[in-house]
Swiss-Prot record:
Belongs to the globin family. The keyword Transport applies. Keywords: Acetylation, Heme, Iron, Metal-binding, Methylation, Oxygen transport, Phosphoprotein, Transport. The lineage of its organism: Eukaryota, Metazoa, Chordata, Craniata, Vertebrata. This is Hemoglobin subunit beta-2. Residues 3-147 form the Globin domain. The modification Phosphothreonine is found at residue 124.
Length: 147
């Protein structure tokens, strides 16, 4: 569960309605893989990830980024039950994929950077604070199975 004020919920849902999940998702995952290259080990089947250009242009990275953002959007619809919403994904990432749960926090932070880049002046400090809070809530829910 993430505790957002009414104002924070309005800011997050209002901006999220304008997010192009194809574009933002691919960019967020791509940036994660470039900025934190050790995360690439979970994406061996994605082909060429040898440099920033290859990563950012990789169709599989873009498709998976879209999938990730769609899941994030589901979390927005279920703010009072993030653990339940992400229970199956938490289990998958913990038991089968063995993803370090810190990567969820890193991805959330990268997502905030990408949103700031895309929305500029509309991504005010209060909007950023609300998204940081939400991203941490999602990361915590995804890490739940690890505890």
């Amino acid at each position: 569960m993430v505790h957002l004020t009414g104002e924070e919920k309005a800011a997050v849902t209002g901006l999220w309605g304008k997010v192009n999940v194809d574009e933002v998702g691919g960019e967020a995952l791509g940036r994660l893989l470039v900025v934190y290259p050790w995360t690439q080990r979970f994406f061996d089947s994605f082909g060429d990830l040898s440099n920033a250009g290859a990563v950012m242009g990789n169709a599989k990275v873009k498709a998976h980024g879209k999938k990730v953002l769609n899941a994030f959007g589901e979390g927005l619809k279920n703010l009072d039950n993030l653990k339940g919403t992400f229970a199956k994904l938490s289990e998958l990432h913990c038991d089968k994929l063995h993803v370090d749960p810190e990567n969820f926090r890193l991805l959330g932070n990268v997502l905030v950077v990408v949103l700031a880049r895309h929305f500029g002046k509309d991504f005010t400090p209060p909007v950023q604070a609300a998204f940081q809070k939400l991203a941490l809530g999602v990361a915590t829910a995804l890490a739940h199975k690890y505890h």
